[in-house]
Amino acid sequence: MAHGIPSQGKVTITVDEYSSNPTQAFTHYNINQSRFQPPHVHMVDPIPYDTPKPAGHTRFVCISDTHSRTDGIQMPYGDILLHTGDFTELGLPSEVKKFNDWLGNLPYEYKIVIAGNHELTFDKEFMADLVKQDYYRFPSVSKLKPEDFDNVQSLLTNSIYLQDSEVTVKGFRIYGAPWTPWFNGWGFNLPRGQSLLDKWNLIPEGIDILMTHGPPLGFRDWVPKELQRVGCVELLNTVQRRVRPKLHVFGGIHEGYGIMTDGYTTYINASTCTVSFQPTNPPIIFDLPNPQGS
């Protein structure tokens, strides 16, 4: 496939033959297509906070997976905050309110948020199934009354919440989606393959910034303890072959914190918490030139 230039024409993504085994998919495409190799694919150093913002640019501040541990985070200067989910432990209304209060004290012009697999109450189908179950895997969530969580996203009064939806701010089209491959039955989990692809097919072309909770295959998705890649193949194909955003921000995999590029799209795993849930990974800033006419 071509690297470094946008794709042309209508592209239809289908379920990849290696969809169910991302580690095998990575190996196959790396050997047969050099899909994850330099010079087009490489690591990117983060921008130091004291770097002046270039004229005619917007500065994005990227964070993720804060898990109700925001008190000690040093937030840098920027224009727009992007938080790609897991801002709570379980999505309890009290946790959401605390997060919203924290957002309210931040100076950014816009704060854009998506849910992650830990925001259980934001996933209506998950909550409906949980109520039917005769067990208490998440006792504090199971005890909630429907009126406590039916419109829990409305508690996020200090941000723009995206869920399979987009917003345009300062001329940038930004789309957010919370879905991740199934992992131990948390919120917004779907089976790999067609179920996830159906969600990615909702992403419109022409998006400048894509926010998902989890990574695409091959970009900041390595889990050393398991010696496995866990990114979504269909998400990778959607990003590289159809949508081609300038920036793809995600989290989910705490071990994958950092920045990469494929020569066209920049990929940021902004997980604030480490694998031991210590909020020590600093926010990542990224500058993009303002769209013409904005």
From Swiss-Prot:
Molecular function terms, GO-annotated: AMP binding; GMP binding; manganese ion binding; phosphoric diester hydrolase activity
Annotated keywords: Cobalt, Hydrolase, Manganese, Metal-binding, Nucleotide-binding
Alphabetical list of SUPFAM superfamilies matching this protein: Metallo-dependent phosphatases
Summary of the tissues where the protein is detected: Expressed predominantly in fetal brain.
EC number(s) from the headed UniProt entry: 3.1.-.-
Regulation: Inhibited by nmolar levels of AMP and GMP.
Function (record text): Displays low metallophosphoesterase activity (in vitro). May play a role in the development of the nervous system.
Full protein name: Metallophosphoesterase MPPED2
Gene designation: MPPED2
